[in-house]
Design a protein with these regions (language model features):
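Short, flexible, basic/aromatic active-site loop/helix in glycosyltransferases
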Residues: 1-19
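Nucleotide-sugar-dependent glycosyltransferase catalytic core
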Residues: 46-47, 74-97
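Short glycine/proline- and charge-enriched loop/turn segments
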Residues: 9-12, 36-39, 80-86
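A short, conserved alpha-helix in the catalytic core of glycosyltransferases
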Residues: 20-21, 25-37, 42-72
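Short secondary-structure boundary/hinge segments and terminal tails
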Residues: 51, 76-77, 121
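Non-catalytic, C-terminal membrane-associated alpha-helical segments of glycosyltransferases
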Residues: 89-98, 108-153
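Ligand-binding pocket scaffold of soluble enzyme catalytic domains
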Residues: 9-11, 24-26, 54, 65, ...
Length: 153
């Protein structure tokens, strides 16, 4: 969205062009993947937005991203593992960093301020609902600052 939220559970039966495809279920020729520089290693932690970045790079190079409703992937929300190994609150660091970095990289700087408010609301909501502790707010702040200063690849 214009304020940085990644839309989830988008379902359609229609095949067509889109800006990006979720990284857990997309295919690209190795030659094209390599030519575009693969995934940007500045996207850190929980694998968020590196797939959108790659889709934007495909389009910028004149390629197309096609959504095909045929293949289906089910994202299992396991209780342990993944980014939760370090600290549940640290996920806000990755999310904040990657969001700001993505918006800067793709010249969407006017969307950074709304994204900051959105990310702050997520961290506060998670605190109120006891999904994460108060450290989530600190991690979100650190991620925002680091995302602002990470050198663009």
């Amino acid at each position: 969205t214009w304020y940085g939220k990644t839309l989830k559970n988008f379902d359609t039966d229609n095949k067509g062009e889109c800006e990006w495809a979720p990284g857990g279920n997309f295919a690209v020729r190795k030659k094209s993947f390599t030519a575009l520089g693969a995934f940007d290693s500045n996207f850190i932690g929980n694998a968020m937005l590196e797939d959108a970045d790659f889709g934007f790079n495909i389009m910028r190079s004149g390629g197309r991203v096609i959504y095909n409703p045929g293949p289906v992937i089910e994202h299992l929300r396991v209780i342990t593992g993944g980014t939760r190994k370090e600290s549940p609150s640290k996920g806000m660091y990755y999310r904040s960093h990657n969001t700001v970095y993505f918006l800067r990289k793709h010249n969407l700087r006017l969307r950074i301020l709304p994204a900051v408010f959105y990310l702050a609301a997520v961290a506060i909501n998670d605190l109120i609902n006891r999904k994460h502790g108060p450290l989530a707010i600190i991690w979100a702040k650190v991620g925002l600052i680091r995302g602002i200063f990470t050198k663009i690849q």
